Amino acid sequence: MDVDVFNGWGRPRFEDESLMPPGFRFHPTDEELITYYLLKKVLDSNFSCAAISQVDLNKSEPWELPEKAKMGEKEWYFFTLRDRKYPTGLRTNRATEAGYWKATGKDREIKSSKTKSLLGMKKTLVFYKGRAPKGEKSCWVMHEYRLDGKFSYHYISSSAKDEWVLCKVCLKSGVVSRETNLISSSSSSAVTGEFSSAGSAIAPIINTFATEHVSCFSNNSAAHTDASFHTFLPAPPPSLPPRQPRHVGDGVAFGQFLDLGSSGQIDFDAAAAAFFPNLPSLPPTVLPPPPSFAMYGGGSPAVSVWPFTL
């Protein structure tokens, strides 16, 4: 690798510029495009480099340019000759078969970072499909670089041709076409409507689920066998009446329930009814049958008084 010194500017130059080193990326600044590349092309029309192709932009559509570029993923660089509309005029022909390039905004000055002197100008153009003035704006953007100021052609050489320009073409990111917007809006509306209808259908189910229940004591439980799942909510627990405090000996003598003469057993049913008068009784189907066991060595079944099993 040697160093090519040109007009006070030094840059490394590979002996075989067609073979780029691994990881090489071509991202020059505006000043570098003017001083390292366009100026050399203007002085020597045979000048070429590994990163910039030479094309006729009037015979190429913007979507064809990435394939004609030597390198680049989002930006592509080209040398091209200006096509004058008239031999003696200054207006440039920027039309292709499918459309035309239209300038937008003001030209931007490119100055030296060291001396602040003017080196060139940058023009921004947008590609329109169709013919003016009814062309359809596209996402393709081109920045056209030309020499100016201290690098003006009459300062360089009388034999230099000012038709050479350097162009950077890119596809503007984040731009969505009209068709894509329509599809996206219709899709989002359909999805929103679907969720809205689903939500309205689920709402009564949730309301029913929250309000309906079947009592465990209902005689119509068989009628709800095929009902939806929300009918199987458990009923709230029954509220027990407040118990009245009683003391042994207050109006009821516990001994009166002893019947030792006949069977030698205690009448627990009568005792429970006397001591717990407000205790609710439940149907026998609610509680499992009480276990049987012998009391005092006898064979009689145990007496069950809810909630006690003896």
UniProtKB/Swiss-Prot annotation:
Result of altering residue 308 to A: Loss of transactivation activity
Native source species: Arabidopsis thaliana
Description of what induces expression: By BRM, at the chromatin level, and conferring a very specific spatial expression pattern. Directly induced by ESR2 in response to cytokinins. Precise spatial regulation by post-transcriptional repression directed by the microRNA miR164.
Lineage: Eukaryota, Viridiplantae, Streptophyta, Embryophyta, Tracheophyta
Gene3D superfamilies xref list: NAC domain (2.170.150.80)
Outcome when changing residue 123 to T: In cuc1-1; cup-shaped cotyledon and abnormal SAM
Subcellular location: Nucleus
One of the GO biological process terms: lateral root development
One Gene Ontology MF term: DNA-binding transcription factor activity
Segments forming domain NAC: 20-172
Domain commentary: The NAC domain includes a DNA-binding domain and a dimerization domain, and confers the specificity of the transactivated target genes.
Listed name of the protein: Protein CUP-SHAPED COTYLEDON 1
One of the record's GO cellular component terms: nucleus
Known role: Transcription activator of STM and KNAT6. Involved in molecular mechanisms regulating shoot apical meristem (SAM) formation during embryogenesis and organ separation. Required for the fusion of septa of gynoecia along the length of the ovaries. Activates the shoot formation in callus in a STM-dependent manner. Seems to act as an inhibitor of cell division.
